[in-house]
Each structure stands twice: as C-alpha cells, then as structure tokens.
Amino acid sequence: MNILIFGPPGSGKSTHSRTIMEKYGLVYISSGDLIRREIERKSSLGREMEAYLSRGDLIPDTIVNTLIISKLRRQRENFILDGYPRTPEQVISLENYLFDHGIKLDLALEIFIDEDTSVERISGRRICPNCGAVYHVKYNPPKVPGICDVCGSELIQRADDREEVVRKRYRIYSKNMEPIIKFYRAKGIYVRVDGDGPISEVWKRIQPLLDYIHSREEKRKEHE
C-alpha cells in the first residue's frame, strides 16, 4: 500500500502518518523530517533551506525532489509520503520515478483545516531548544508560562511558527495544491477528510478508508 498524505500547516497529517505507519506496517517518508535533519546538520544546504523556511517560502523543487527520490530508491513499496509532492513540478518528478519503477499509488489523502484553525494550532506552539519538548499555549501549556517542564529552559517560538508566516504558508499551500488535487482526483485516488476536531475523531474518519484499501491489496496479493 502506497499513500500520499497532504494537509495545510497544523492539519495533524504527520501525527496521522505515524499512526498509519504503525498500524499498516508502512515506511514513513516525511519531506519535513528530511529537511529538518539537513538543517540540524548545519550543512550549507541546511542553512539555505532554513533561510527559505524562516521567510515562509517553499524550498526549491530541485532540492526537495533530490531528498525524496533518494529516500524512495531505498524503499520501493509500502510507503507513506508525508507532505510531498506539493508543487506541480514535484508531481512530475514523483510520477516519473514511480512510472520508471512500476510503482502504483493507492491513495492521495488530504486532511483539511481552514486558515484560522491552522494559525491557532501552529502559532501557539512553543519548543524547548534544549531537550526538544513541545508545548502549546492553549492545548498543552507548560506548568510555568514560557518555561520547559522537563529541563527548565526558556521556551521559544520557531520563526516559521509566527502567525504572519503561518498565514503565508497556508496560502502558498492552498494555491499550489489546486492543480495537484485536480491531478490526483482525475486519477481517482484523491480523498479529502475533515481535519477539524480531536486527533481521535479525525482518525475515525480516516481508518475505514485505509482498512478498505489494505483489505483490497491483501486480496489482490492472494490472487497473484
């Protein structure tokens, strides 16, 4: 089972991706994780990508395509791609790779939330720069405002979590996703799920769809 999962900032797609990975035994490939690892390495490429993100801009397609395709070459089947492709050029790169290697996508899933929900979820996030603990000023606040419960360090707001940056990211996402959604809808594999509400409620909307696809794939393998 090969899945693409999309969603605007704060949609919860990465959380659901990990649940899907664990439940269905898929390999999780996240464009965000690959980018963050490169930034943490403080390589010249990482610094270049960090500059784009701090402005709320998308990282150039050539960079993202290289990161993702390199990862896919090590995992031909049974994957979930989180946050990729997100531009028409990335779609072309991915589709060419899949065609060349005889790989079929089963689902392009979008978890949708509106712009104000995206801003509330993301701009309230606070990170501990020392131990990596994550908080939210509304949904998961620290015991002492601005201070990490775990190590006592002062919490920070990441540059790309600021409200003005989140709104810019949301609008870029919405604009770029229009042709991508149209493409995968035409292929008959696009499904949009309402991402509003608690994670557990959203999962109840997603799971029946994945169970159906998983069951279909298992039956297909039995008859091969």
Curated annotation (Swiss-Prot):
Residues that, per the record, bind Zn(2+): C128, C131, C148, C151
Protein name: Adenylate kinase
Purpose: Catalyzes the reversible transfer of the terminal phosphate group between ATP and AMP. Plays an important role in cellular energy homeostasis and in adenine nucleotide metabolism.
PANTHER family noted in UniProt: NUCLEOTIDE KINASE
Cytoplasm recorded as keyword: yes
GO BP annotation list: AMP salvage
Enzyme class: transferase
Region listing for LID, in residue ranges: 124-161
Keywords: ATP-binding, Cytoplasm, Kinase, Metal-binding, Nucleotide biosynthesis, Nucleotide-binding, Transferase, Zinc
Record-linked InterPro entries: Adenyl_kin_sub, Adenylat/UMP-CMP_kin, Adenylat_kinase_CS, Adenylate_kinase_lid-dom, P-loop_NTPase
Known pathway: Purine metabolism; AMP biosynthesis via salvage pathway; AMP from ADP: step 1/1
Comment text on domains: Consists of three domains, a large central CORE domain and two small peripheral domains, NMPbind and LID, which undergo movements during catalysis. The LID domain closes over the site of phosphoryl transfer upon ATP binding. Assembling and dissambling the active center during each catalytic cycle provides an effective means to prevent ATP hydrolysis. Some bacteria have evolved a zinc-coordinating structure that stabilizes the LID domain.
Superkingdom of origin organism: Archaea
Gene Ontology molecular function, alphabetical: adenylate kinase activity; ATP binding; zinc ion binding
EC number: 2.7.4.3
Compartments, as annotated in UniProt: Cytoplasm
Residue ranges of the region described as NMP: 30-59
Stated family: Belongs to the adenylate kinase family.
Binding site residues for AMP: S31, R36, D57, L58, I59, G83, Y84, P85, R86, Q90, R158, R169
Residue sites binding ATP per the record: G10, S11, G12, K13, S14, T15, R125, V134, Y135, G197
